[in-house]
Amino acid sequence: MAYAVREGDPTSTGGVVVSASATHQVQERRLARMGDPVWCPACEQVGYIAQGNPTFIDEYVAVATQGHYVKCGCKRGTHTLIATQQSLAADMDATIEIPKDMAKAAKLRAEKMTAVRKAGGPSWDRL
């Protein structure tokens, strides 16, 4: 099943989704979408969700589901999302890649968040 990922959900590298949708929640946690930031302790960077499910849309953005890829400093395919709920799933297990313009904006946001973290900002690995 293509279970929806939420803010605070873990990743395969021990990371965590740090921010998500402002409009939709599941079990009192916001839905994660393509472009949303993810902390990665393996490479010590904030990355972003690089895939989404085209059958599940929030504010014109594909929602992230179990197994979708996180773009960070790690080798492609080694950092994926883990859904912690099983009450909400997409209609189909489908995947699209993040559009280039959205990826560019997500990368800039992730780089800024990484800089803040390195300067003593929030420690997401303690969530």
Region locations from a protein language model:
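Intrinsically disordered, low-complexity proline/glycine-rich segments
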Residues: 2-127
